[in-house]
Amino acid sequence: MIGNLSGIVDEVRSDHIILNVNDVGYMVYLSAKTLSACAIGSRIKLLIETYANNRENTTQLYGFISEEEQQCLRLLVKVSGVSYKTAMSILSKLTPEQLFLAIMNEDKVTLKMSGLGLKLINRIITELSGKVSKLEINNNNFHPINEDALSALINLGYEKMKAYDTIKKYRPNLDTKDIIRMALKELSTL
């Protein structure tokens, strides 16, 4: 079993890289977000998840920059009907924080994407809602927020994740009116 790989990026493709580790090139599949951080010639260290694809008689490597993203993949593939490829496409669209919030809030709109039907989205929410709340999450990645400010922005028509990403920058103990005012100002410039 491979825990991590550290090497130089030789090639960047649409869904994977070739990582040169001591003159051996490993094909490592990445989420779109991780892939966008890779440049040919750059040195990178990835956490690795190994998948033995028995149907195609191959072993595939999936790479992650953060433990949270790796945890998400491990949780997602335990859900019946979620393949590694599907899990990676989810992680390409959502950060671990956004995924956890969508599951905890049963936010089907955020989870809706190509390749995920309503039944599978419901199964993901049902099977993972209890597990997500018990996860050990790096406190640097999850921020307490002013729920009233979030609710106000959503009621004004802003997308839930965009509103959350905006107001998490402000201290939750600020006055709700001030948070809403600052968030509206920021959202109007986007």
Swiss-Prot record:
Gene Ontology MF terms in the entry: ATP binding; four-way junction DNA binding; four-way junction helicase activity
Domain notes: Has three domains with a flexible linker between the domains II and III and assumes an 'L' shape. Domain III is highly mobile and contacts RuvB.
Recorded family membership: Belongs to the RuvA family.
Name assigned to this protein: Holliday junction branch migration complex subunit RuvA
Record key words, sorted: Cytoplasm, DNA damage, DNA recombination, DNA repair, DNA-binding
InterPro entries membership: DNA_helicase_Holl-junc_RuvA_I, NA-bd_OB-fold, RuvA, RuvA_2-like, RuvA_C, RuvA_C_sf
Lineage: Bacteria, Pseudomonadati, Pseudomonadota, Alphaproteobacteria, Rickettsiales
Region (Flexible linker): 144-147
Functional note: The RuvA-RuvB-RuvC complex processes Holliday junction (HJ) DNA during genetic recombination and DNA repair, while the RuvA-RuvB complex plays an important role in the rescue of blocked DNA replication forks via replication fork reversal (RFR). RuvA specifically binds to HJ cruciform DNA, conferring on it an open structure. The RuvB hexamer acts as an ATP-dependent pump, pulling dsDNA into and through the RuvAB complex. HJ branch migration allows RuvC to scan DNA until it finds its consensus sequence, where it cleaves and resolves the cruciform DNA.
Species per Swiss-Prot/TrEMBL record: Wolbachia sp. subsp. Drosophila simulans (strain wRi)
Chain segments carrying region Domain III: 147-190
Compartments where found: Cytoplasm
GO biological process terms, semicolon-separated: DNA recombination; DNA repair
Domain I: annotated span: 1-65
Cellular component GO terms held in the UniProt record: cytoplasm; Holliday junction helicase complex; Holliday junction resolvase complex
Quaternary structure (record): Homotetramer. Forms an RuvA(8)-RuvB(12)-Holliday junction (HJ) complex. HJ DNA is sandwiched between 2 RuvA tetramers; dsDNA enters through RuvA and exits via RuvB. An RuvB hexamer assembles on each DNA strand where it exits the tetramer. Each RuvB hexamer is contacted by two RuvA subunits (via domain III) on 2 adjacent RuvB subunits; this complex drives branch migration. In the full resolvosome a probable DNA-RuvA(4)-RuvB(12)-RuvC(2) complex forms which resolves the HJ.
Region (Domain II): 66-143
